[in-house]
Amino acid sequence: YADLGGPHGYVVPIFDAAGAQLSENCQLLEDAGLIYVADGPDTLNLVRALRESPALEAMARAFDQAAVILGMGAGAAALGDWIDDPEAQDRAQPGLGWLPSVIVGPRFKGTEAAHRLRRLLDVKPNCLGLGIPEQTALGLGPAGEVENVGPGQVTVVFSGLEVEA
């Protein structure tokens, strides 16, 4: 980012619940103007590390001070109300709840991804599913703004009904 004229960034090392408790990590998050919740192999562990932690509270304070929260892949899924439980196909686990009543399906492509998202909506029928393909983002603004960015189309799934946004 510095090569493009952007400000200096830093990595906040939260890899487990212990990292989410450290005051220095929380201060870095609270002072941030942009928080990037990265992709990774295990959404459930990410959520468990952050849930009800000082780090999550620091992220909320940063957001209240106009920070942008960006979730990528598993990071985007974690921001939803519910996430896929990798250990049980017909079970959902609580997400971080930043997107109330939403289940995010990252890397959304093809019928398998659509079936997985619909299966989660069968378990949590009062939710909205957002299928986000690779190289595509969904921007949500504080005043209700919605923008699809990138070459793919975000798919919105209501229990049984699928609509491209």
Locations of regions flagged by a protein language model:
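Extended, subdomain-level signal for the structured scaffold at the beginning of enzyme domains
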Residues: Y1-N45, L128, G139-A165
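Small-side-chain structural scaffolding
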Residues: G6, A32, G71-A76, G80, ...
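A sequence-level detector of short, solvent-exposed, charge-rich linear segments
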Residues: D16, R48-P54, A78, V123, ...
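Structural motif
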Residues: E24-Q27, R61, P94, D122
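C-terminal and late-domain segments of enzyme folds
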Residues: L34, I83-A165
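Class I SAM-dependent methyltransferase SAM-binding "motif I" and its flanking Rossmann-like core
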Residues: V37, P41-H115
